[in-house]
Amino acid sequence: MTDNNKYRDVEIRAPRGNKLTAKSWLTEAPLRMLMNNLDPQVAENPKELVVYGGIGRAARNWECYDKIVETLTRLEDDETLLVQSGKPVGVFKTHSNAPRVLIANSNLVPHWANWEHFNELDAKGLAMYGQMTAGSWIYIGSQGIVQGTYETFVEAGRQHYNGSLKGKWVLTAGLGGMGGAQPLAATLAGACSLNIECQQSRIDFRLETRYVDEQATDLDDALARIAKYTAEGKAISIALHGNAAEILPELVKRGVRPDMVTDQTSAHDPLNGYLPAGWTWEQYRDRAQTDPAAVVKAAKQSMAVHVKAMLDFQKQGIPTFDYGNNIRQMAKEEGVANAFDFPGFVPAYIRPLFCRGVGPFRWAALSGDAEDIYKTDAKVKELIPDDAHLHRWLDMARERISFQGLPARICWVGLGLRAKLGLAFNEMVRSGELSAPVVIGRDHLDSGSVSSPNRETEAMRDGSDAVSDWPLLNALLNTAGGATWVSLHHGGGVGMGFSQHSGMVIVCDGTDEAAERIARVLTNDPGTGVMRHADAGYQIAIDCAKEQGLDLPMITG
């Protein structure tokens, strides 16, 4: 048994520069990215190992964290560390092209895959919720979801408002690690936004990092600001301290009409992530310890009220969509039979991108030098010269996005381009243009790496929403291809029982061997997304598979 102490009063910051603390960059990289996940600029509650998303942790407890760090510093380049739900459980001899770390987080046999059983295991120190990029050590702060949210808002603007969100406003809630991206994404897309958040500390953090522009004093003040800025055609984001389950019904009652409605509260985790209406945060946390069943019930009842208000907006013809936190499922379990009347964001706006393997490609500069990221930004523009939309994103990102922890960048690119960029970055390390290696990873929210019937795989054309072979195959292929670390998780985004997903990270250290691994992994990884969607019958994916020369025996053979 290990010490299940999850609190330590300490500040962690990844090493910078090009001096190694481990034996090679292949082990230095996961070490730095683990530490970066717990940087106070990055993590929501680093002293309790919580990175984002309710209780998404980087390690099971502090004893496990210490042992992971110790093991990574001694790991050889023909050894692989196995991490089981945030606990380092073994080091085995493999080979130099194998992953240096293999991670499995939060996985439960399906019959027991629910929050009640997971919470029992967590309390005993036998499990850890890894979310998606918390336990896989590739979280880069809210930037990691900004572009995906931006792409969603832009596509919604195309579909509903003739391509322009000028003078429009988005109503949403949640300013945590994921939801905190919403105000900036809306601003970049040209819209105002009203962002409800129940924790003042989260509002303060988003103001400090320039993800949100202003805070209103109360609802009347917020609506007055929205009216002023939309009339002026300005894109300003406004935070409001309050509870969405109280404020959304009040807006419906007043006849207020937003132009778009969504939500990114941590509704996936009623015990830890959604404050019941009428409760203080302190009451919520205290009662979670003493009467968890009552807390879950109260949170889900409030979610039902919240979703009913969203349905009311939808009935008025206002574009309304779930942004992947499973709030519709929670409301349905509380008796809101038509909770799924409004769609999720993936089938509504994102799936055509997934069909081409396009998703959240990200990289981080292990040097800690922002100039390394700016140089890679320029390289992306050079190699993809004709994509004005992507260039605009990179320009806006440089101007508006504050780095959190190690400098990083995200841009949505797909099959073909990911490998091209990865190989170019590796050459930049080789030539000394970059001052230290970079790591390339992605969110588990990607085209071929997740099965989540209420989010990424909602309403698949062939009805295969719940088939979870695909992320397993993705993880196996990335392991075979030589990713530096590979992860396989359960329950990220939408909570226990509702998703399985995999992640990969690969190091660009400037070597020939790295180039070979990069070419394989950054082709195969998005390739599985095209494969998955082609198999489901999407013509865009079938065409992409043929154009890119994928060997899909039942489709291209």
Swiss-Prot record:
Biological processes, Gene Ontology terms: L-histidine catabolic process to glutamate and formamide; L-histidine catabolic process to glutamate and formate
The protein's required cofactors: NAD(+)
GO terms assigned for molecular function: urocanate hydratase activity
Catalytic activity: 4-imidazolone-5-propanoate = trans-urocanate + H2O
Residue ranges that the Swiss-Prot or TrEMBL entry lists as coiled coil: none
Top-rank taxon, per record: Bacteria
Gene3D superfamilies for the chain: Urocanase like domains (3.40.50.10730), Urocanase superfamily (3.40.1770.10)
Xref: InterPro entries: Urocanase, Urocanase-like, Urocanase_C, Urocanase_central_sf, Urocanase_CS, Urocanase_N, Urocanase_Rossmann-like, Urocanase_sf
UniProt-listed PROSITE patterns: UROCANASE
Protein location: Cytoplasm
Cofactor remark: Binds 1 NAD(+) per subunit.
EC number(s) stated in the UniProt entry for this protein: 4.2.1.49
Binding site for NAD(+): 53-54, 131, 177-179, 197, 202, 243-244, 264-268, 274-275, 323, 493
Active-site residues, as the UniProt record annotates them: 411
Keyword Metal-binding: no
Pathway membership, UniProt: Amino-acid degradation; L-histidine degradation into L-glutamate; N-formimidoyl-L-glutamate from L-histidine: step 2/3
One term under GO cellular component: cytoplasm
Described purpose of this protein according to its UniProt entry: Catalyzes the conversion of urocanate to 4-imidazolone-5-propionate.
Family the entry assigns: Belongs to the urocanase family.
Protein name: Urocanate hydratase
